Amino acid sequence: MSALREKLDHLIGQTELEVSEKQRSQLVGYVELLNKWNKAYNLTSVRDPQEMMVKHILDSIIVSTHLQGKRFIDVGTGPGLPGIPLSIMNPDCEFYLLDSLGKRIRFIKQVIHELGIDNVVPIQSRVEEFQPEEKFDAVLSRAFASMTDMVEWCHHLPKEQSGVFLALKGQHPRDEIDLLPEWCSVTDIKALQVPELDGERHLVTLSRQG
């Protein structure tokens, strides 16, 4: 067993997550590809693959149990975070991964090809210019922008009645909440426990008022 797989198994063992053998292999494969491509394309500031397991994989999949719906868009996905790990964890759901930089989308296309992921749609576009044929159950954001910018730029993406915004944040974002537009309200804030991660993590759920 590889050191990366041992690390992943150890981290998952500290959570309530149920992760199959296939999913574990795909998550390790993703980190191996990210580490390989990162040397040439500078996709993440995290250089150590062991550290990627904590800061990128666990920090993403810990959100999995909080997803409701079948159709999601990850805006400002970068190299596919949290979209790729979440797509691996939720093979019955559809994930659109959006980023404006071509090198990131090329990497994501390579990942889904090599790992056999068939529930991801990569999109190269600015978020405010992307017009989906069908709206989404949730708009996901991790290290993308302030929550105000997120909801303003992505207001056209969630389903009118039931769609939500899910913002993955560090410390409790009290200051950002105070600045949200009047049409947007916070419906839930969950403190997330990410094994071996220094610092706090919070998942903020935002929805339209009324």
UniProtKB/Swiss-Prot annotation:
Keywords: Cytoplasm, Methyltransferase, rRNA processing, S-adenosyl-L-methionine, Transferase
Catalytic activity: guanosine(527) in 16S rRNA + S-adenosyl-L-methionine = N(7)-methylguanosine(527) in 16S rRNA + S-adenosyl-L-homocysteine
EC id: 2.1.1.170
Compartments reported by the entry: Cytoplasm
Top-level EC class: transferase
Secretion signal span: none
InterPro entries the record matches: rRNA_ssu_MeTfrase_G (IPR003682), SAM-dependent_MTases_sf (IPR029063)
Main subcellular location: cytoplasm
Entry GO terms, CC: cytosol
Domain of life, per lineage: Bacteria
One example GO MF annotation: rRNA (guanine-N7-)-methyltransferase activity
Annotated residues for binding of S-adenosyl-L-methionine: G76, L81, V127, E128, R142
Family membership: Belongs to the methyltransferase superfamily. RNA methyltransferase RsmG family.
PANTHER family in UniProt: S-ADENOSYL-L-METHIONINE-DEPENDENT METHYLTRANSFERASES SUPERFAMILY PROTEIN
Protein purpose: Specifically methylates the N7 position of guanine in position 527 of 16S rRNA.
Protein name per Swiss-Prot or TrEMBL: Ribosomal RNA small subunit methyltransferase G
Species annotation: Vibrio atlanticus (strain LGP32) (Vibrio splendidus (strain Mel32))
